């Protein structure tokens, strides 16, 4: 394989909903380029892309697969991405390191929720988009309707380059309005027959050709002037206008294929090779200092590692993009994230499960290495004299969580190691060892996401695991003022223990004025503040601790011990054992003994006094509330809203976005436990959602009583 220069390289992501045919398209592209002699299929479990056992088990792509084809003296690096929303991390990774997105649309269904999700990410990243309508041989495909729907969603930027003469099982020909030719195939596919457009199609073809020319001309002043003068453009001018329109996202060309028979795939590849922008024609990326980094092969050497694969008999395979410079076997590089040194071994061009040895990779290219010493997903390796990092891939918050346990305690350590290893392969996993909940929790993107994790743990790692709903991280607080006092006294021969603490508690809010006077049962307590400590608590909220003791009733040296006693109770609230928050504590009096008082005595006295005061101060349980955005087809809006209301959600607003309804709500975390499953069931898998932590709010009284009763029962069981 020859060395490709930066201006000969194009990086392309294949994205779209599950079942839109991305892996099948990848097979056809490899076949057309002569990389493989026979097309595999998902059903036969022999595709280049879906080579991991878990993918073959479920019949879905789980990981993004990187491969390349050499086409007309150009190198096309292509990433075949998972379509399921549960594996959206793979698509996000690919869209960040490639320069163009081909968004596949299943001709039977038109734009689906996966189409919308991927388009939104391309919008955020400002990536060029080509729409590709697949499955034109389906009975349910109505191309004219589909294009009308797409233009309603994406506007006039969505411009057909091709249209089929007919759809359904008899599909075998299309009209290309860029080249103004008819392409047709034998029923089994094969080489296209290229002919002039039939007379009965000329009017429609000319109308679409004119729309394409006009859309292309809008991207260049000179082309626009020529279009106004001559009402046409040459083929080269048309290509140039489309290329500029792709870069500025002012045009979204629509192509047609039947990927299963390779019909239209060769023509698509010609367009990718001839028209879509090269790496060095795209906007520059930025390092973490905000500096632009150009894909210049003569620049400083810098590699960004965007993916790690774990392969049997090989170990870690590390995939990277050459951000600048050129990388060669034997180069010495420094990991700017970890401070370690790496020597480059054999370099490879990516080919799915296979790798093609190469000696050099230039700026903008994608490649991989095996068995690196200390490189993780997201790391940057730099050459001598440069220290920069890249951190441009942002993954969505998790949407589905489960507590995970190994079936035997002896395997717990092995389980943690396996989970951390799998997170290298899929950074959307979040593994949390919760000290608060005493659980190991895995956070993912959906039920299917966790199901594949379980399969891999059991089949690849030989670990038996169980899942269950995680506990909810409730909080406790108070709603009114209260006071309490407690004397801790212990005498059993020798030195005794003595400490007495009088304190007041009240709800705390940011910016509250310092206390001056309190009244309880007609008695007035004036405060004389000697010291104040405000703590931002690790679990959220604040504790304000005030020393208002006068007359030497308690030595100042015992105040840290009293604060420790208060913090002990804040870490285990009296209602449910949950963390407490947003409390102000004023220690205003107490007693000590000249011999028997010590730090332990005051810690114990403070615990009891605080607990008694907390219970008398209108204690309440708080639950985590999340912001929820649901993207749903209008037909399902009523069912989705009804379901949310049954989950104690508060609807905050509704809006239309790209053909879907966007519903915004606030919902308790407890009600999100199985929401991904319910939403999929309600909408036939045609909706998606995102979540983000918002705040803690009071639980309803009936739920509070239930939670307290459950906690008391747990404590009783532990004591027995």
PLM regions and their residue ranges:
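Short, surface-exposed connector motifs at secondary-structure boundaries
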Residues: 73-75, 99-103, 126-132, 248-253, ...
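Gly-rich Lys/Arg/Thr-decorated short loops/hinges at beta-loop-alpha junctions or inter-strand turns
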Residues: 46, 72-76, 96-102, 216-226, ...
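Amphipathic alpha-helical transducer elements in NTP-driven molecular machines
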Residues: 6-9, 23, 45-46, 59-63, ...
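P-loop NTPase switch module centered on the Walker A-proximal segment
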Residues: 1-105, 109-111, 160, 204
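Short, hydrophobic/aliphatic alpha-helical segments
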Residues: 4-7, 45, 236-253, 357-365, ...
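Short hydrophobic beta-strand that contains or immediately precedes a catalytic carboxylate
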Residues: 78-80, 255-256, 442-443
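P-loop NTPase catalytic nucleotide-binding module
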Residues: 1-20, 107-312, 333, 367
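Accessory interaction regions appended to the cores of large information-processing enzymes
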Residues: 149, 158-160, 164, 168, ...
């Amino acid at each position: 394989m020859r060395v490709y220069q930066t201006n000969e390289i194009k990086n392309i992501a294949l994205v779209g909903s599950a079942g839109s045919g991305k892996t099948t398209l990848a097979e056809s592209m490899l076949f057309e380029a002569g990389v493989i002699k026979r097309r595999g299929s998902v059903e036969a479990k022999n595709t280049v892309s879906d080579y991991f056992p878990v993918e073959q088990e479920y019949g879905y792509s789980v990981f993004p697969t990187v491969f390349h084809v050499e086409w007309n003296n150009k190198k096309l690096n292509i990433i075949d991405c998972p379509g399921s929303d549960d594996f959206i991390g793979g698509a996000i990774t690919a869209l960040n390191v490639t320069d163009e997105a081909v968004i596949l649309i299943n001709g039977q269904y038109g734009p689906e929720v996966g189409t919308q999700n991927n388009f939104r990410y391309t919008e955020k990243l400002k990536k060029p988009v080509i729409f590709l309508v697949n499955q034109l041989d389906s009975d349910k495909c109505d191309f004219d309707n589909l294009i009308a729907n797409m233009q309603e969603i994406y506007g006039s930027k969505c411009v057909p380059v091709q249209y089929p003469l007919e759809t359904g099982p008899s599909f075998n020909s299309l009209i290309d309005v860029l080249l103004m030719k008819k392409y047709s195939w034998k029923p089994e596919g094969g080489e296209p027959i290229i002919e002039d457009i039939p007379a009965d199609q000329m009017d429609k073809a000319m109308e679409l050709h004119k729309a394409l020319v006009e859309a292309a001309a809008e991207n260049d002043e000179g082309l626009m002037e020529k279009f106004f003068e001559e009402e046409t453009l040459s083929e080269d001018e048309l290509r140039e206008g489309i290329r500029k329109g792709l870069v500025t996202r002012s045009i979204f060309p629509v192509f047609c294929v039947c990927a299963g028979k390779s019909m239209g795939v060769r023509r698509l590849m010609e367009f990718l090779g001839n028209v879509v922008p090269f790496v060095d024609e795209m906007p520059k990326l930025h390092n973490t200092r905000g500096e632009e980094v150009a894909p210049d092969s003569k620049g400083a050497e810098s590699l960004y590692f965007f993916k790690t694969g774990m392969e049997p008999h090989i170990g870690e395979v590390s995939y990277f993009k050459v951000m600048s410079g050129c990388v060669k076997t034997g180069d010495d590089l420094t990991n700017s994230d970890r401070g370690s040194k790496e020597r480059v071994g054999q370099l490879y061009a990516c080919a799915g499960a296979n790798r093609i040895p190469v000696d050099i990779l230039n700026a903008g290219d994608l490649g991989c290495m095996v068995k690196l010493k200390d490189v993780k997903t997201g790391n940057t390796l730099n050459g001598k004299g440069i220290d920069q990092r890249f951190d441009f891939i942002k993954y969505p918050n998790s949407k589905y969580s489960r507590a995970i346990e190994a079936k035997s305690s002896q395997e717990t350590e092995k389980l943690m190691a396996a989970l951390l290893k799998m997170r290298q392969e899929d950074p959307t996993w979040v593994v949390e060892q919760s000290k608060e909940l005493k659980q190991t929790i895995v956070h993912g993107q959906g039920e299917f996401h966790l199901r594949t994790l379980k399969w891999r743990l059991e089949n690849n790692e030989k670990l038996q695991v169980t899942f269950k709903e995680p506990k909810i991280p409730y909080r406790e607080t108070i709603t009114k003022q209260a006071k309490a006092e407690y004397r801790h006294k212990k005498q059993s021969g020798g030195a005794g223990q003595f400490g007495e603490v009088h304190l007041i508690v009240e709800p705390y809010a940011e910016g509250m004025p310092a206390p001056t006077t309190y009244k309880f049962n007609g008695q007035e307590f004036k405060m004389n503040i000697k010291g104040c400590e405000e703590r931002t608590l690790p679990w959220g909220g604040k504790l304000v601790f005030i020393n208002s003791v006068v007359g030497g009733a308690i030595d100042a040296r015992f105040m840290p011990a009293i604060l420790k006693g208060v913090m002990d109770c804040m870490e285990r609230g009296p209602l449910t054992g949950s963390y407490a928050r947003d409390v102000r504590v004023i220690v205003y009096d107490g007693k000590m003994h000249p011999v028997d008082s010590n730090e332990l005595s005051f810690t114990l006295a403070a615990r009891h006094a605080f607990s008694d005061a907390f219970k008398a101060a209108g204690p309440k349980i708080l639950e985590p509330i999340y912001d929820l955005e649901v993207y749903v087809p209008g037909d399902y809006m009523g069912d989705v809203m009804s379901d949310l209301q049954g989950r104690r959600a508060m609807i905050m607003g509704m809006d239309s976005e790209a053909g879907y309804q966007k519903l915004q709500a606030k919902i308790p975390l407890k009600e999100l436990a199985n929401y991904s499953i319910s939403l999929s069931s309600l909408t036939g898998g045609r909706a998606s959602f995102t979540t983000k932590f918002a705040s803690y709010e009071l639980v309803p009284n009936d739920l509070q009583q239930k939670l307290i009763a459950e906690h008391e029962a747990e404590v009783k069981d532990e004591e027995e």
